[in-house]
Amino acid sequence: AADRLEADFRNPRRPDLVGRVSLGDPSAPVTIVEYTDFECPYCRQSVAVIHQLLNRYPGKVRLVIKQTPLEMHPNAMPAALMFEALALQDGAKAFAFYELMYAEQERLKKEGQRFVEEAARRVGADVPRALRDQQGDQVRALVAADIAEGQGFGFTGTPAFVVNGVALEGAHPVENFV
């Protein structure tokens, strides 16, 4: 792990952030890129940690979400696609959806696309547009690129993070991010 950390400092990982929505100050000096799966219980735990970081360091930290739905979680892909569809409309709505998916993760697991659509409505999205975009080539290509990027970084599970170029895999306490 120490060797990998040193390698990341020498040659930082550079996730593609072009056109991605973020939570927190877009010009913050620290960028946390989270590779997430909306059905992953460890990803759900990480939401509280991310909130602590954003609240503890206002203006200093921003969060960018990358989609890495695992095959073992069949409802993670529709949720991932919807997050990105909503991001095309409004970043704030996409992040409200992110919060809702983790707050009501059991409903996502049980209800799948039906809950994804309900959540899009609840965050105030243009649902017909979101449903079109959810199935569209642009959103599908974006999620496929996120998956490939995470695999290219050697990530084998979720959550995984890249913090200013340095990788962290798994759920971590706040202290590991600062």
List each model region and its residues:
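Short clusters of hydrophobic/aromatic residues that line enzyme substrate/ligand-binding pockets
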Residues: 23, 108, 168
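Short, flexible loop segments at the rims of nucleotide/cofactor-binding pockets, characterized by
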Residues: 10-11, 41, 138-139
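Short, flexible turn/loop "capping" segments at secondary-structure junctions
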Residues: 24-27, 75-76, 160
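Long amphipathic alpha-helical scaffold segments
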Residues: 2-17
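A short beta-strand-turn-helix
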Residues: 14-30, 55
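C-terminal cap of thioredoxin/glutaredoxin-like
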Residues: 1-5, 35, 51-52, 114-178
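Structural alpha/beta surface segment adjacent to cysteine/selenocysteine redox centers
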Residues: 33-121
